Structures are given as C-alpha cells and as structure tokens.
Amino acid sequence: MHAFIVPPKIVTGPGCIGELGTEASRLGRSAMLVIGCKSVASAGGTDKLRGQLTAAGLTVEVFENVHPEPPCQDVDTLRQRIKTHGSDVLVAVGGGSVMDIAKAAAILAFSDRPTAEHVASQRLPDRSLPMIAAPTTAGTGSEATPTAVLTDKSIDRKKSIRHPELMMPKVAIVDPELMLSCPPGVTAASGADAFVQAVESFCSKITTSLTDACSEKAIVLTARHLERAYRDGSDLEARQAMAEGSLLAGMALANARLGVVHGLAHPIGGRFGVPHGLACAVLLPYVLEYNRQVLEASGKYARLAGLLGTDPVRFAWNLLKSLDLPSDFRTWPVDRSLIPELAEEGMDSGSTKANPRPATRDDLAALLEKVL
C-alpha cells in the first residue's frame, strides 16, 4: 500500500497571492507572517501581505529574521514569538529556508524542549499549528513537502525532521508573480534544485505511478524553462512553468524521496556553507553517472533521456554551463580531510537510502573526492 501525501489545498496562477487573507481566515485569527525574501520586503510586499491579513480580520505579527540554511536557534526564536503573540496560524512567504523554519516552528509550537533536542531525537509532538506556504523562489518545492531541513550550528550539521500530516502546509499558494524579482543567481541555484529534485524523485527506488507522473512533468517543465527564467527574470511564462515544476517536484519527493545528490548536498552545505541548490546542481552529473548502470537496467535512464531529449549526464553538464555554475567545489574553502565524515553523514541520510543504486561509505567518499 502507498499513501500519496499532498497539501489539502493548492492555489496557483498569476495574482493568486490575493487569496491569502481569505485562506488564512479559515485557519485562524492571529497570524505569524514569516518573511525571508528581501525583495518582498523592499518592494513593500510585507505591508501588502499584512494588509491582506488584517483586512480578513486577523491580527498579524511579522518575523523577518530568517537566515539561509536555518539554524535550530532561529526556530527557537520564532517559537517564542509565536507564544508571545498567541499566533494560531503561520503564513510563510519566501524561499526554502522560510518554509523550513515555519514548518519546524509549527510542529514544535506546543513543545517546551529546544529545537535541537527534537532534531537529534527525531521525536515530534502530536499536534501542530496550521500553516500557509507561498514560495518566492521556484526551487525546494517545500510548499508541498512535510519536511524541514535545519542546521545544528554546534556540530555544523544539517538534519531534517518530517511528519507526513502535521508538517504539511494546509494551503500552498503558488504565484509566479512573487518570483519575478528573484535575482538571476538565486533563480539559477534554486531552479537547479527543483530540476534535481524532479530527477531524483523519478529515479528513486520507491516510486509509484503517481510520483512518476509528478516528477516526469516537473522534469519537462524545469528543463525547458529554467534557463529562460535565469536569462530574463521578467518572463512570466517561464516563471509560471518553473513554479509549477517546483511544486510538482515537491509533491513527488514528498512521497518518493530523493537520492545521493541530496544525501551529500546537505553535509556539504552544512560544513562549508555551499548554497543547497548549487550543491545539488554540481553533484547531479556525478551521481547520474554513478547510477547509470542501474537506471539503464530498469529502463529509467532511457525514459529520462526521452524527457530531456538528450543523454541525461550530458544534459546535467550542459545545465551547469548554461546557468554559469561551477563543475565542482574547488573554488570553495573546503576541507578535504573531512571527506570520511561527510561520507558518514551521507550514509545516514534518508535520501541516500532511496537512491536507485545502493551506496557504501566508500562509494560516497569516491564521489566526494571528485567534486571537492
């Protein structure tokens, strides 16, 4: 038996952020508005969002202190603000980090224990606050996943927490107009993450016909429109396609998981500060080559080539060039002596466990030797 978990309600299309007040008023009366995108705040977006919520009868508190790869301490700060304000619904408008911190705060809102303890023990409360997610980047697809990735700064490690029901946003509002001001560099890295998630969820060893349907469409949408969105951020058609592709990839990975790319991207990001999307983009061609034999045997490699219109490994290399991204991490201040530890962390990842080709610690170390 397979359960297919998605947000109860998904609203999409240009201008659909205008439904925010209506949707929030159905879930609560006191909103914690979590904002992370500087372009939203600088364009007066925070005031507009607050205005929609207050017009719908909600009181509003704004939380803007969101860092990339959010640390557990930031979740603790947000949880305290939620208690002080008496918030009964979270509204997250931003990229993947905003979604992560909001989902973590929602599930831990009723706990008195530090976030880091919950992350370490993987024990979560049995109730949460409802949440609305409105992405400002096409990337993580977090508006459609029940997972939050957090950084424990005390050990420089990224770990995820997951609850299939209590951490899934109640409403996903996916408006491409929120993404028009996303800078080219962020568009490239986050969009590459969306593409990689579509590919890895398609190649996962625990796919179903439903996850394949989502990931296949996501692959086509992101492969065809990512460079367009990168070259011209005002291209609404490309932004819409990327928004839908990211959403579908999120729906796929929420149910099929991912693979070694994400299994290694998290420790690389946690240890060396490499942005998550960039880490995923760089790792993809190496991991596709690692998985090639198994994917060819299953027929997935040929199906992926059909979706892309070319050899998948070649496409992954060309994607890096088209987005002006590096082919390895050697320009970053990485410490190669940590490769054994990074490989160990990769082995602990649920993403690695879903990889189509089983991986050993030595396999992961060999991949890391190539990219670091």
Cite the ranges covered by each PLM segment.
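ATP/NTP phosphate-donor binding region
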Residues: 1-89, 329
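Buried hydrophobic positions in well-ordered alpha/beta secondary-structure cores of metabolic enzymes
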Residues: 13, 33-34, 71, 96, ...
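Short glycine/serine/threonine-rich phosphate/pyrophosphate-binding segments
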Residues: 17-20, 42-45, 72-73, 97-104, ...
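Glycine/threonine-rich beta-strand-loop-alpha-helix active-site module
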Residues: 73-176
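Glycine-rich phosphate/pyrophosphate-binding beta-alpha loops
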Residues: 139, 247-280, 349-353
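Carboxylate- and glycine-rich phosphate/diphosphate-binding segment that chelates Mg2+/Mn2+
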Residues: 147-256, 356
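Gly/Pro-rich interdomain helix-loop hinge
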Residues: 271-338
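Short, amphipathic C-terminal "tail helix"
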Residues: 338-372
